[in-house]
Amino acid sequence: MDKNDTMKNATIIFCHFVFYCISFSLQAQSSKKLISGPWAGNVELRTASIWLEVSKQVKKVHLTYKSKGSEKANKVAYRGNLERDFNPVKIDLVGLDFNTNYEYDIWVDDEKIELPFATKFTTKDLWQFRKPAPDFSFLAGSCNYTNEVIYDRPGKSYGGDSSIYETMAATPAQFNLWLGDNWYYREVDYSSVWGLQYRASHDRSKSALQSLMASMPQYAIWDDHDFGPNDANQSFIFKQDSRSIFNDYFLNPTCGQDHKGIYTQFSYSDADFFLTDNRYFRSHENLEDSIDGKPNNKKSFLGEQQMEWLKNALLSSKATFKFIVSGNQVLNQLNPFESMQHYSFEYNSLLQFLKTHKINGVIFLTGDRHHGEVIRLDREGNYPLYDITLSPLTSGVAKPHASELNNPQRIENTLIEEQHFGKISISGPKNDRALTLEFIGKKGQIISTWKINQKEITKQ
């Protein structure tokens, strides 16, 4: 090899090196511009929304999407504000086809973002009046604590193994439902609006979450820790700001009514989900539960406005299964901590309403307790009610209180004292639909199962 060849080869190697460095630098810059996401939510028959968060230096965002196998892609630009401290982005897609697979790409400052996971979603099927209700599954869980040592309490870290989210991402399901305490505000967070925004943004950005969020649509309620301080109630001075932040970081269909609360509703197949808000309207737990021997009608758990909405929504529902979703347990009579049981006026009102109007198929779905269980409430002359509690995802595990260790309401073999999530599957022919609950551990192992037929939660 002569000197010229040596110089030529050296030049080629150098050019490859420079190209690699530039490519790596551009990829690193792109990744820094994308804080978290993207993921698809509120996926309906002909519409969907895409969520992501970008950094302060980003000036514009758009996405391209197409049905799977199609050559032509559509472009939608984000028209909202950017270049702020926190920049959650929502882009709505309309005019879609039902029961269709879609793929999408994110572009930040005209650069396509390369991601280690697929970005896709499937619109709902138009099954009504045409075919049997589709079988489906969904995931659910509560209490996601992300460690940040400088702001955490001294001692052992409260947050657990976040690999549970990789397990959830790999578990086939149509959507995931967050049951509250989806992040944990600390003392440094809930004393300012900026602090609330920081916590939501910081915890959502964790790498372990990204594949789960992208793998299926996400729905959510909140509890105290992602609303404000521990056991927070209607007195929290930043409750309106907290509501806005929650709405910024999730893609629920709506967010309360009249700019109050976060309650909403969605449907999948022959199931309706009533996502309640147990914080915005809530009275303090220690307010008198009864006055002169009568339930105190001024002590609110859901509040009058939300209770009226819930009752009317239940009356309107024709679903086989009606899931009332709450951040706190509802039916556990031995729960000494936060529970709707301690708000007897609203609790009695709701149960009497279910009885009077013969509302069938009701299942309560709750979080908060740092252990899982299924609670049964027998009712004279009516079907029993069930409360499925799923907790925790990554926060600390807690045993039941001594007073409820041998709770006669608890279904046998459903006490779960480890990190877990639930997979709930609805299947079967019309009038013989069944619900199967699997408690699944962080490594994907099935810890316990429970099953019930629609006939068992129907007034005969």
Regions flagged by a language model, labelled:
Residues 29-460:
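Metal-dependent phosphoester/phosphodiester hydrolase catalytic core
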